[in-house]
Amino acid sequence: MPAPLRRTVLYVEDHPVNALLMAAIFERRPQLELLIASHGEEAMQLAEGLRPVLLLLDLGLPDCHGAQLLGRLRTLAGLETPPAIAVTADAGFQIEGTGFCELWSKPLHLEHVLARLDTLTGLPPMPLQRLTEPAQPRSQFAALS
């Protein structure tokens, strides 16, 4: 029996520690594949031909604002409709009119992120479990651990 297809999530984050944290969170959702880009241009290149089920975008990227990047990503085939989340330390950012459906404030809260990942990606809810060994991130930041 073939393994079920994993659902792809694109995360754009320029701070390696935040990227590692998100990768560790995603270790609790093996049905999801997290792809991490560190800036807008890399995100555009990664997104070509992908069909992510969810977009997670930091706002303060080195080459653009996350809202501008979202507008550019929406022009790519297959990226017109996936939910987009602003992931930011700027809790005052207003998402109205930006194309984001939610704002996740940093620092992230594990239970909230896992519950929202389940809902937004269509996964059945999973119980919160304690990790028995350190998470191994699947990204270009893996060498930092």
Stretches found by the model and what they are:
Residues 58:
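Active-site residues of response regulator receiver
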Residues 85-88:
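Hydrophobic/aromatic residues positioned on beta-strands within the core alpha/beta folds
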Residues 13:
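Conserved acidic carboxylate
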Residues 36-54:
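Acidic, metal-coordinating helix/loop segments flanking the phosphotransfer/catalytic sites
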Residues 16-35:
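Two-component/phosphorelay signaling modules centered on CheY-like receiver
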Residues 108-121, 129:
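C-terminal output helix
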Residues 39, 65-71:
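Acidic catalytic/metal-coordinating carboxylates
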Residues 62, 92:
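The feature encodes the CheY-like receiver
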